[in-house]
């Protein structure tokens, strides 16, 4: 149930009846403060201006046409023309009952779309590092949310599996007589990569051989393709371990690397030339874009094929967008790539639109994100100044969580402790990131993320177990509880119920904007409201069975909402802490 959408529809009809244009925006929002009701319609200002009347006068006319019987107990005009809506406790009670009767908690499904989500994108022959964390977990939270809402989601792991580095790596492996790359661990490959690069830079003969190998690889030579495949296989096997540890839904089947688009590039260049979009300039093939200016103020030239015939990332990204629309039949494409790539993507997509490869009706959205910083406010590094490997970060998270959990549960069996430490440690790293607005940089701080107070994973996981503990203490007759009515008579009951019923609205925002922090803030709010409700509205010692059962049902919906909400974020819940 989307109460915001229901009220928007009702207010919009009343505004039109009061003389507003048919496309008027009611601007119904969740109220920021309790005294302003549960929802507020703020659209009178803009519409009144167009109609040449005072907003308050319009609001009064709207109220004469606004029928919220059975939904609101009170509707009032505030300030210059805001309409405050207070939901009826009987309506809240009925909606709580309906939410509990459904596995989906009453969340409706919008029109089904095919949505491609591009995220993670590590490089072959390199271990994943902390720079891959944000794209991987924010993208996965978006995927989980969209799938829960019923969309057909195609995960696209755009791995860096093509380019000159493969000639270099194959040449170096050969030089070391270690063609059987399949037996090497990725840690070895990291060393190989460094050594290969050193030789490539210092030994012209080796560099020449590496360049020849690239040509052979690109021309489809069976031996070189086999060597390349081994490098990709080792990398993706290692990455899968990291994905599984992170509780991320990516698998090997989701890999759509740069190599996939390689055969399409000559055709793209030829087509852009034929359409008059690409021209020869100083030996290279270039698209000049009026939308972007160079330092001189002239249209910026975007190279799509170099003088030597090589292609660029832009060419690949053009082919990639075209493929996602024409072959995958995407209705919408989301890219979880850091903010530094914004101009590059905008240029590629401008070319895509001009060439007619993807119509304007299909959104290409760059859901960019900021950087992960250390406590010093600089990019997060090891003490020695190197890049932090993702596996090392997760090992440390597990170790810290293990100590924390053991301290609080000295008698817990070892296997249970390990399971709990894993949920808390990995959850803490993910939630610390997901709870921040993705567009900003954030400070990575172990102490904050593992704290049991504040908007953290341990607090949220504990809040969930606290609700479950009510049911462990109660001697519950499941049948009697299922048929018991919900009674909303206290303010704290009404506040908790109203917030629980805003779950669908929260999911809708996350799906539209790709902002998991909105879900984190919502769940934290729910946990806080439950805490106040638990303190002031006795559950097990309620004055009678009817009130007890009603409050148990509110607790039940709280537990289900927390669990489902955390699941859309990829955060594991536990039964006890």
Swiss-Prot record:
SMART domains: Arg_tRNA_synt_N, DALR_1. A motif ('HIGH' region) lies at residues 122-132. Pfam families: Arg_tRNA_synt_N, DALR_1, tRNA-synt_1d. It is found in: Cytoplasm. It catalyses: tRNA(Arg) + L-arginine + ATP = L-arginyl-tRNA(Arg) + AMP + diphosphate. Its EC number is 6.1.1.19. It is an enzyme of class 6 (ligase). The keyword Repeat does not apply. GO terms for cellular component: cytoplasm. Belongs to the class-I aminoacyl-tRNA synthetase family. This is Arginine--tRNA ligase.
